[in-house]
């Protein structure tokens, strides 16, 4: 997989689930999030990116919305690039 596509394995209890994430998957997830819709996009992200042979095992775990958010959050955190970002302080002096 290249730098933008990632195969990520999460261990949940005694089960391992491998997910294949692409930029398109992550973009679709973020675009689906709304103020009143957070769990369904997470559920969709998990179910569409988990390896086919583990879907049936994963599905019952996603009945708990907190589990959905925890797994999706962990998956996205692992997918995120490791980049150092620094915010520069503004000058207190106004310029004309």
Walk through the language-model features, giving the residues of each.
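Short, surface-exposed, charged amphipathic helix/loop patches that serve as local interaction elements
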Residues: 2-6, 15, 20-96
């Amino acid at each position: 997989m290249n730098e933008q596509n990632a195969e990520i394995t999460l261990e949940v209890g005694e089960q391992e689930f491998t997910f294949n994430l692409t930029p398109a998957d992550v973009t679709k997830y973020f675009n689906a999030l709304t103020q009143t819709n957070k769990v369904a996009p997470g559920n969709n992200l998990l179910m569409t990116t988990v390896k086919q042979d583990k879907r049936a095992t994963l599905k019952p775990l996603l009945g708990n919305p907190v589990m959905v958010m925890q797994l999706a959050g962990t998956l996205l955190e692992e997918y995120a690039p490791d980049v150092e970002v620094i915010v520069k302080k503004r000058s207190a002096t106004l310029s004309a």
